[in-house]
Amino acid sequence: MSCQTRFDEFLVLEFSDPGYGAVHHLTVAAYLLQHSSQLTREGWLYERDLLRAFIIENKPPSLIRKQNRDKVDSGKRDFKIKSKTGQPVIAKTTWAKTICDVRAENAETYCADVTEWAKSAFGESEKIVIDG
């Protein structure tokens, strides 16, 4: 199963069951961090900063949304998040954990696995230096 297929299935699960949706913010940020061709350089750095806020600073998504409202408003933002070229922002990386390692048999297991995956992705991403 491809990462994209798995991601799409998990989004459906997260939007249809609040127990799974509790980690939606981590699912999206970790996935995008590991699939840099979907982002601009600034977008990739922004997603990494989001994971830092969620994981290291333990900030809830509601606070981050409030703090970043103007920063990510497409009418006010001074950078693009989504890539128009599809070119990877980072060199090909072999990640220790990916979305394919997440189990979905119940919400508790799913949330624990997504959290561990996001922590792993963030930790590895901290070692990646992006020129520019």
Regions found by a protein language model. Name each.
Residues M1-G132:
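Intrinsically disordered, low-complexity linkers and terminal regions
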